[in-house]
Amino acid sequence: MMYAFLPHLKKVNHAAIVNVSSGLAFVPLLISAVYCATKAALHSYTQSLRVQLSNTPIKVFELMPPATETELLGDFEEQDMQGISVMNTDKMVEAFIKGFERDTLEIRPGQSNQLRFMSRFFPGFILRQMSRPVENMHRSAGKAR
């Protein structure tokens, strides 16, 4: 759909594309591997698009929210969310607006910024930390048998 609008966006003085991915683009969460993979793909696509459109009036932003109070979280069990802080929707929107106004092309509020940092400098450690709740669930299930 975005490609249908590109000719129109290129004609104006200022335009923006905003893709919404996730902090989970940086580190997979075992209980939602496909979700994380799609967000990682969107992150890569957004970076490529930003370079492709760098000589146009179009800015390409990426909002990478952390776990946010939305209906999506209702799909997870409480035990799945242990150790994960959840951002209020209003605060996430405020962070987006602030980043957008400052021309921050990659907006990573809350834990998303921490995930990016940890994935770059301590990739094995953060993957083990993110995997721990799932491993604990498997151990508990094994003991129950």
Locate predicted features.
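Conserved catalytic-site region of short-chain dehydrogenase/reductase
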Residues: 25-27
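C-terminal tail/cap regions
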Residues: 85, 90-145
